[in-house]
Amino acid sequence: MMIDHPAAHAEITAAFAAYEAALMANDLEALDDFFWQSPSTVRFGVGESLFGFEAIAAFRVGRRGGSPQRQLRSTQIICFGETCAVATTEFIRENEVRIGRQSQTWIKFPDHGWRIVSAHVSLAAEKS
């Protein structure tokens, strides 16, 4: 298995950046398109555990104003072969002292391209 296949890495890096832009713009249609539309998709958020694409989409519709604005740092994207990638990043939100963390597992589907199959967003405790 090739780690960080150049073409796959370029594709997923672009997809990750497009996801972040859609998140900051609260573009619900685009955000839905980034997730695998399956009951097996999972998203653990800061205050919610969402099982299945429908639950994730419903959460976004009900979220007033969308995601708090943030700045990313320490982003890492690693491809495992040409069809699996893990993206991790830290983020900083305005008026929040805790550092945010996000991890996403992306799979490239033959008919749909890259989709998030699992995501986790959390805020680090001030002390561990």
What are these regions (language model features)?
Residues V46, E54-I99:
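Surface-exposed, charged secondary-structure patches
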Residues Y19, L31-D32, G52, I56, ...:
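Hydrophobic pocket/interface hotspot
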Residues I3, G45-V46:
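Second-shell loop/turn segments in exported
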Residues V86, I99-S128:
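Short beta-strand edge/turn micro-motifs at domain boundaries
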Residues A15, D27-A30, F59-R60, R73, ...:
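Hydrophobic alpha-helical segments typical of transmembrane helices
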Residues F35-W36, F91-R93, H120-L123:
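Short beta-strand segments enriched in hydrophobic/aromatic residues
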Residues M1-Q37, E126-S128:
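Short, low-complexity N-terminal intrinsically disordered segments enriched in polar/charged residues
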